[in-house]
């Protein structure tokens, strides 16, 4: 959860893990303030094989197939798959009343700079169809810290760049500490 002076954001996923398969149960997203409010509620009914809910007051009702994830749980599945040594990953992600395919590939190992120091990481890129999007996203997962996402670099269609970098953190009761130069 994050909150700013004039805006708020909350994203919550409930899921189960069944033999290395993430099964979403519910997904809630709420953003308020700055004139861009958005509310999403989705429930994943595995017995009825349906995703039901609302996205910006529009009803969602789509068939649910094994392997489908919400917009938060796929990130955990990606982290899990990188930790398992997979090099090419594809996820079916429910986005409103559609199901999008998110593809990723491992680019290799790299020592990456973060606010917590230099971290040995696995570098992963989001694979997009260049005829549909020139947006680029690269992620780094820390090898020695349970594959925690420690850095993300995104270049938008308009060329604007964004970077998210780990400042501090704790994994299994230990303070995340990178190497010094």
Where in this protein do the model-derived segments appear?
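Acidic, serine/threonine-rich low-complexity disordered tracts
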Residues: 1-46, 84-181
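Hydrophobic, well-structured mid-protein blocks that either form specific transmembrane helices
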Residues: 36-81
């Amino acid at each position: 959860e994050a909150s700013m002076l004039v805006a708020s954001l909350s994203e919550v996923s409930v899921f189960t893990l069944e033999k290395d398969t993430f099964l979403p149960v519910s997904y809630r997203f709420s953003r308020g303030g700055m004139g861009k409010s958005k509310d999403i509620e989705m429930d994943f009914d595995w017995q009825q094989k349906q995703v039901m809910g609302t996205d910006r007051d529009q009803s969602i009702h789509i068939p649910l197939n094994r392997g489908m994830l919400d917009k938060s749980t796929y990130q955990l599945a990606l982290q899990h798959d990188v930790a398992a040594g997979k090099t090419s990953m594809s996820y079916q992600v429910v986005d409103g009343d559609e199901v999008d395919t998110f593809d990723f590939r491992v680019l290799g190992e790299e020592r990456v700079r973060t606010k917590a120091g230099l971290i040995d990481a696995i570098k992963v890129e989001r694979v997009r169809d260049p005829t549909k999007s020139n947006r680029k996203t690269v992620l780094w997962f820390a090898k020695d810290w349970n594959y925690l996402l420690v850095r993300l670099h995104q270049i938008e269609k308009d060329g604007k760049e964004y970077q998210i970098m780990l400042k501090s953190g704790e994994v299994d009761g230990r303070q995340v500490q990178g190497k010094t130069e």
